């Protein structure tokens, strides 16, 4: 996605501040906006959903972006700029995972109590971050890997995790019981793996006159909710 029209960036104070900050840091405003949206969504409680306009299920706010750019073009810098704008994401872990099974383990774990295992919430939110798309492709291409389909399940807020005979390792997180965002940095040569998608955030910027702004953006404080509201 690209937003070359100044009318878009000037339509809201927050958008203008994002663009000004990105330009002052010599990074793409489009990429900074995309990651900023991810961070704001990560801080949003999982019980906040979209209305069921199609079918009977709610829509999820879970979100993912791909930052596209050549080596050294500032993909990581754009990620860092968004972090400076929205530093508080409610203690959400920011990490990559090597398998689909590990995703559910970010949100919950089985603990033994009185001889029985129960599911305990570790965190209601998480950000999956892959600084190189080649790493994500390698992990997804591994034999019997379910990483990619499990990541796709995140975007619609579906139940994640598998039920196994080993109750200690059986971690399933209910639908809309977690908040997840995904940020992947990719070089143009890697875009083939995302060709089924609808778009990506460009890391290029035509602006050439950097200027400095002050202040930061934050989201209102909210009470921490369980990742298993149902």
Regions found by a protein language model. Give the residues of each.
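Phosphate-handling catalytic cores of nucleic-acid transaction enzymes
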Residues: 1-230
């Amino acid at each position: 996605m690209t937003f070359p029209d100044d009318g878009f960036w000037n339509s809201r104070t927050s958008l203008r501040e994002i663009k000004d900050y990105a330009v002052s840091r010599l990074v793409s405003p489009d990429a900074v906006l995309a990651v900023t949206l991810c961070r704001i969504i990560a801080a949003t409680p999982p019980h906040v959903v979209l209305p069921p306009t199609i079918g009977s299920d709610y829509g999820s706010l879970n979100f993912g972006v791909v930052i596209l750019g050549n080596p050294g073009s500032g993909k990581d810098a754009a990620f860092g700029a968004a972090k400076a704008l929205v530093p508080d994401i409610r203690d959400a872990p920011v990490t990559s995972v090597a398998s689909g099974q590990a995703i559910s383990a970010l949100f919950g774990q089985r603990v033994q109590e009185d001889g029985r295992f129960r599911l305990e919430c570790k965190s209601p939110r998480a950000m999956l971050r892959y600084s190189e798309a080649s790493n994500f492709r390698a992990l997804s291409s591994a034999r019997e890997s379910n990483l990619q389909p499990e990541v796709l399940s995140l975007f619609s807020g579906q139940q994640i995790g598998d039920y196994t005979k080993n109750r200690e390792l059986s971690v399933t997180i209910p639908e809309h019981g977690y908040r997840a965002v995904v940020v992947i940095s990719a070089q143009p040569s890697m875009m083939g793996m995302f060709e089924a998608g609808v778009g990506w955030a460009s890391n290029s910027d035509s602006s050439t006159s950097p200027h400095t702004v002050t202040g930061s953006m934050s989201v209102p404080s909210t009470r921490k909710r369980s990742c298993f509201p149902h």
